[in-house]
Curated annotation (Swiss-Prot):
PANTHER family hit by this protein: DIPEPTIDE-BINDING PROTEIN DPPE (PTHR30290:SF79), PERIPLASMIC BINDING COMPONENT OF ABC TRANSPORTER (PTHR30290)
Disruption phenotype: Inactivation of the gene results in a sporulation-defective phenotype. Disruption confers resistance to bialaphos.
Keywords for the protein's UniProt record, in alphabetical order: Cell membrane, Competence, Lipoprotein, Membrane, Palmitate, Peptide transport, Phosphoprotein, Protein transport, Signal, Sporulation, Transport
Modified residues (Phosphothreonine): 470
Induction or repression: Positively regulated by TnrA under nitrogen-limited conditions.
GN (gene name): oppA
Disulfide bonds: none
Species for this entry: Bacillus subtilis (strain 168)
CDD domains according to UniProt: PBP2_OppA (cd08504)
Lipidation, S-diacylglycerol cysteine type: 21
UniProt topology in membrane: Lipid-anchor
SUPFAM superfamilies named among the record's database cross-references: Periplasmic binding protein-like II
Subunit structure: The complex is composed of two ATP-binding proteins (OppD and OppF), two transmembrane proteins (OppB and OppC) and a solute-binding protein (OppA). OppA interacts with FloT in detergent-resistant membranes (DRM). Colocalizes rarely with FloT membrane assemblies.
GO CC terms, sorted: ATP-binding cassette (ABC) transporter complex; membrane raft; periplasmic space
Protein name (database record): Oligopeptide-binding protein OppA
Length: 545
């Protein structure tokens, strides 16, 4: 989360502006905060309309933030960030590590009372792999034998090696041993879909109602598009006795100053990441009064280059733009959330990639940037920067992204003499632009969908793969990623991934800017929230003391 980004991965992570008169500088409880002891409704902000609340279509942090409360996979992530049994009560692995057999829990049900079966998982995974459904995260299923061939039209869905042996047993065959497969099965692309409902109503996921059924700790009971979402406790959930909240009210406020004010007024119980955002100018005061929470997470903020659009099809132009950025200035003066300048793709929080704190190139290396610019101009038959084709820098509407883009625009003009035009659009419009490569340079964030460095590289394996968006691919890069998936020695595997990252940085289809931190404030009585460190949040064990 696209995480991702994720992550989606992604991703809506930061904002910046707060007027001097708008921040009252209160403590964590906020002025006008009502007594929250023992209450059972959680009020949070998710900023914008989700891209999709279909587990097979979701590819951003907003959608994932809702789905993680309403659905559950064969496994789920616990408070230690580790996978544990979810819908599956038993997980067996073959000696060669390539075959998994999941036993579905007794009595697990959908929110409408239908039994959750192994067939619901087989149906969901094959639905995501069906190329007609255009799932951006289908590649997360490529670990399964036959999955990539089916998704790319070179094979049949019937040959995908996921099989419901019976209602209680799901058998999965992988291409190679994948030690983190039980982390993958907690990710939303691997979550089940009620086959009976989905076949009856192809648009089941577009509104709240009788057909929006889920199997997680909460169920969606209301969805006012672009306004709010209401979740209520799912009494059919197998672990319902540990779910203390009766309701989660999610509002969509795409103004960070307003979000903080509503928190201070007691209208929100949480303000900031990972689902909302704090005004950056409020962070020093919130930190000083002790109410600010800051945690490094496995995530990176970068600018994607459309490598098939001029002048970004020239690697030296891409390098010139990347090397000329002053990341330290951005994190110190703009984002102000203790982020780390990124001169690499994989966050240094990933084991084996600790050296990425330093990265592959110097920050703010204007001298080298000018050399790359001169070389790129010569290759294009141009004499000066002003001769370059028009460049547009795009981002989704948000104060934070706007401020970062303005800073970058100024750096490129000052350091290289390159003029860029800024372009913003609402999230759903923007993400469509990226996926269709209708852009030149576009901001994006990527959060680890699971705790492995391949997260930040594999989305660029194939130029037409979901969430790549850059039009870039490299045969040697792809070869190294494939080798890493068969290498069982952890040290050797990390070396393969480092080599792949080296190729990626050398060809520069993205300009990394900073590694993320989560910054937020919360009601002092709110406890039990699970934040594993990869940018997601779970409220199934949350409560007000």
């Amino acid at each position: 989360m696209k995480k991702r980004w994720s992550i989606v991965t992604l991703m809506l992570i930061f904002t910046l502006v707060l007027s001097a008169c708008g921040f009252g500088g209160t403590g964590s409880n906020g002025e006008g905060k009502k007594d929250s002891k023992g209450k059972t409704t959680l009020n949070i902000n998710i900023k914008t309309e989700p891209f999709s609340l279909h587990p097979g279509l979701a590819n951003d942090s907003v959608s994932g933030g809702v789905i993680r409360q309403t659905f559950e996979g064969l496994t789920r992530i616990n408070a230690d960030g580790e996978p544990e049994e979810g819908m599956a009560s038993k997980i067996e692995t073959s000696k060669d590590g390539k075959t998994y057999t999941f036993t579905i829990r007794d009595g697990v049900k959908w929110s409408n009372g239908d039994p959750v079966t192994a067939q619901d998982f087989e149906y969901a995974w094959k639905w995501a792999l069906d190329p007609n459904n255009e799932s951006q995260y289908a590649y997360q299923l490529y670990y399964i034998k036959g999955a990539e061939a089916a998704n790319t039209g070179k094979g049949s869905l019937d040959d995908v090696a996921v099989k419901a042996v019976n209602d209680k047993t799901l058998k999965v065959e992988l291409n190679n041993p994948t030690p983190y497969f039980t982390e993958l099965t907690a990710f939303y692309t691997y979550m089940p879909i009620n086959e009976k409902i989905a076949e009856k109503n192809k648009k089941w996921n577009t509104n709240a109602g009788d057909d929006y059924v889920s199997n997680g700790p909460f169920k969606m009971t209301a969805w006012k598009h672009s306004g709010s979402i209401t979740l209520e406790k799912n009494d059919q959930y197998w672990d319902k006795d540990k779910v203390k909240l009766k309701k989660i009210d999610m509002v969509m406020i795409n103004n960070n100053n307003t979000e903080l004010k509503k928190f201070q007024a007691g209208e929100l119980d949480w303000a900031g990441m990972p689902l909302g955002q704090l005004p950056t100018e409020s962070l020093p005061t919130l930190k000083k009064d002790g109410s600010l929470h800051v945690e490094p997470i496995a995530g990176v903020y970068w600018y994607k280059f459309n490598t098939e659009a001029k002048p970004l099809d020239n690697v030296n132009i891409r390098k010139a733009l990347t090397y000329s950025l002053d990341r330290q200035s951005i994190v110190k003066n703009v984002t102000q959330g203790e982020q780390m300048p990124a001169m690499a793709a994989v966050p240094p929080t990933m084991k084996g990639f600790e050296d990425n704190k330093e990265g592959y190139f110097k920050d703010n290396d204007v001298k080298t940037a000018k050399e790359y610019l001169e070389k790129g101009l010569k290759e294009m038959g141009l004499s000066k920067a002003s001769d370059l084709p028009k460049i547009k820098l795009s981002y989704n509407t948000d104060d934070a992204h706007a401020k970062i883009a303005q800073a970058v625009q100024e750096m490129w003009k000052k350091n290289l003499g390159v003029d860029v035009e800024l372009d913003n659009s609402e999230w759903n419009v923007y993400i469509d632009k990226l996926h269709s490569q209708d852009y030149q340079i576009g901001r994006m964030g990527w959060l680890g969908d699971f705790n492995d460095p391949i997260n930040f590289l594999e989305l660029f394996r194939d130029k037409n793969g979901g969430n790549n968006d850059t039009g870039w691919e490299n045969p040697e890069f792809k070869k190294l990623l494939n080798q890493s998936q068969t290498e069982t020695d952890k040290t050797k595997r990390a070396e393969l991934l480092k080599k792949a990252e080296g190729i990626f940085i050398d060809e520069m289809p993205v300009a990394p800017i900073y590694f993320y931190t989560d910054t937020w404030v919360q009601d002092e009585n709110l406890k039990g929230v699970i934040m594993p460190g990869t940018g997601e949040v779970y409220f199934r064990n949350a409560y007000f003391k």
